[in-house]
A protein has these predicted regions:
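A charged, aromatic-enriched C-terminal amphipathic alpha-helix characteristic of glycosyltransferases
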Residues: 18, 60, 300-330
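Short alpha-helical donor nucleotide-sugar binding micro-motif in glycosyltransferases
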Residues: 232-237
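A short, active-site helix/loop in glycosyltransferases that binds the activated sugar's phosphate group
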Residues: 103-107, 112-136, 144-146
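Glycosyltransferase donor-sugar binding loop
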Residues: 41-45, 165, 192-206, 223
Length: 331
């Protein structure tokens, strides 16, 4: 049994970030292989996110001390509870490094544990922050669920279909995108821009969604909360925008889009450059002019060919990610 212990605080909700997508995908693949796996939450009861992931086993614990009785291997997600485990535990670090004030606490989280990061960039940053050798970290790269690679592409459209599917949070570059959409060239080039209203589980996402309610320069579409719907959306898009203004540890959405045959224009920052499957265009972050240029370059390249998509699908595969996880856990 491999138990992924969700961190204290929020429940595991679909459509709220890469940590959720990554964890759910790992559990599904482990189960497919006949390896028992589950998501464990503390203090949420049945409101722990299981509604969003009906195909994944959830175990709701009342107290953190109950983690000590979990059989098999415990994998803490992002933050660890201060409890002993039957076997050596692991911690997987999806998030960015926090402020220096949290260094001692984060060092305590990794004590006597297998430490996993989700990109080379992220691993380097965490090694520096935690003051540990980079060689101590195991890199278990993210992936695209196979459904993204098998999603049927929509027929070509006269207008280029541009999609922003990140959360409506400032760090995801939503304000950079809005500045781009107000540029005259974007209003006259005939592209069709859609913005997914994801990230409304927190106040800032709700605020930005309300602000965009009557926005004239893009179509607002509801968030997709499962891989099938997300794969369909990407397969009906030509260019995905990821104008992040902070150094993301990786960027699973970039990989998913490329597997779906969608070109990606993303900020050249953090782990995003590592997501290149052959359909990625990198641009300077916080620079609307650079983002417009990147969009123009991606559009000029045209729709991805069947060969380009097949080559993209050979990168960041789910089975390879789970193989790396099992090696890191010595299983």
């Amino acid at each position: 049994m491999i138990s992924f212990v969700w961190p204290p605080g929020a429940a595991m909700l679909a459509g709220t970030g890469g940590s959720e997508t990554y964890t759910a995908g790992q559990v599904r693949e482990l189960l497919r292989r006949g390896i028992q796996a589950q998501v464990v939450t503390v203090g949420h009861g049945t409101k722990d996110g299981r509604k969003d992931f009906p195909d994944i086993p959830f175990l709701a614990l009342n107290n953190a001390s109950d983690i000590s009785r979990l059989p098999g291997t415990v994998v803490f997600v992002n933050r660890a509870y201060d409890v002993p485990t039957i076997n050596k535990a692991a911690i997987i670090l999806h998030c960015i490094t926090p402020g220096v004030a949290q260094r001692k606490q984060r060092q305590a989280y990794i004590a006597d544990k297998i430490v996993i990061a989700t990109s080379i960039y992220s691993g380097q940053q965490w090694a520096l922050f935690l003051n540990i050798p980079y060689s101590r970290l195991h890199i278990v790269l993210p992936f695209a669920d196979p459904i993204f690679g098998s999603a049927k592409r929509a027929k070509p459209s006269k207008k280029t279909r541009i999609l922003y599917a990140g959360r409506l949070h400032p760090e995801k570059g939503i304000y950079t995108l809005l500045e781009v959409l107000h540029a005259e060239v974007m209003r006259k080039n005939g592209h069709r821009v859609s913005i997914v209203t994801a990230g409304q589980h927190v106040e800032e996402g709700q605020t930005i969604a309300q602000m965009l309610r009557d926005y004239p320069y893009a179509q607002l579409i509801p968030a997709r909360n499962n891989v099938t719907d997300m794969a369909t959306l990407l397969a009906h898009s030509d260019v995905l925008l990821m104008p992040s203004v902070f150094a993301e540890p990786f960027g699973m959405l970039s990989v998913e889009a490329q597997h779906a045959g969608c070109r990606v224009v993303a900020s050249n920052i953090g782990g995003l450059p590592e997501t290149n499957c052959g359909l990625l265009t990198l641009v300077e972050p916080r620079n609307p002019r650079a983002l417009i240029t990147g969009i123009e370059q991606a559009v000029a390249l045209g729709a991805a060919t069947k060969k380009e998509r097949e080559e993209a699908k050979d990168n960041f595969m789910l089975d390879e990610s789970v193989n790396s996880l099992l090696m890191a856990l010595h299983l």
